[in-house]
Curated annotation (Swiss-Prot):
One annotated Gene Ontology cellular component of this protein: periplasmic space
Pfam families for the chain: YceI
Swiss-Prot/TrEMBL keywords: Periplasm, Signal
Family affiliation: Belongs to the UPF0312 family. Type 1 subfamily.
Species annotation: Pseudomonas syringae pv. tomato (strain ATCC BAA-871 / DC3000)
The keyword Signal is assigned to this record: yes
Keyword Phosphoprotein on entry: no
Signal peptide interval: 1-23
Domain of life: Bacteria
Location of this chain's protein in the cell: Periplasm
Protein name in the entry: UPF0312 protein PSPTO_5071
Length: 192
């Protein structure tokens, strides 16, 4: 009788454990250059300026079986802005726009994840930029996950969002320069 009870308990525990999805924790792989925050903004309505932020990092938790339980936290150094033009970078970093001396960091903290397809989701979160915190939605795509050649385990994503800079107290030189398109791509390495 005791053997049957122990066997039933072991089987029940195994089934319960198998039925519960476990989110894994990841660190965004910026050291391996597998992480990018790129942007595009209109230049006076005539063309587009493309740029990136070189210094940012973050963490996330993810389980492909239960993406709604995912969470992400990202911090970005605003002074790491790069548009391949030193004078323009200096101007965008000045008090006229980002004011990186006063606001050296931008931060995103997710508050909800809603699946929109087999590998897509809307990630809602609070973005703090230029001293203002506002909710935004990132349209995210899960690119895949698996073992890497160095003994780790990775998961990769990309996402897009559009920001109205006026919402964050940043004034552009005209109405066409108020909308900034974000394109985010990253791999995370699972914490051991």
């Amino acid at each position: 009788m005791l053997k049957k009870s122990l066997a039933a308990l072991a089987l029940g525990t195994a089934l319960l454990s198998a039925g519960q999805a476990m989110a894994a924790d990841y660190v965004i792989d910026k050291e391996g250059q597998h992480a990018f925050v790129d942007f595009k903004i209109s230049h006076l309505g005539y063309s587009f300026i493309h740029g990136t932020f070189k210094d940012w990092d973050g963490t996330f938790s993810f389980d492909a079986a239960k993406p709604e339980a995912s969470k992400i936290n990202v911090e970005l150094k605003t002074a790491s802005l790069f548009t391949n033009h030193a004078e323009r970078d200096k101007h965008i970093s000045s008090k006229d726009f980002l004011d990186v001396a006063k606001y050296p960091e931008a931060k995103f903290v997710s508050t909800a994840v809603k699946s929109t397809g087999e590998k897509t989701a809307d990630v809602t979160g609070d973005l703090t930029l230029h001293g203002v915190t506002k909710p935004i939605v990132i349209k995210a795509t899960f690119n895949g996950e698996g073992k890497d050649p160095w003994g780790g385990y990775r998961a990769g994503f990309n996402g897009t969002s559009t920001l109205n800079l006026n919402d964050f107290g940043i004034k552009g030189p005209g109405p066409t320069s108020q909308t900034l398109d974000l394109d985010i791509t990253f791999e995370g390495v699972q914490k051991k």
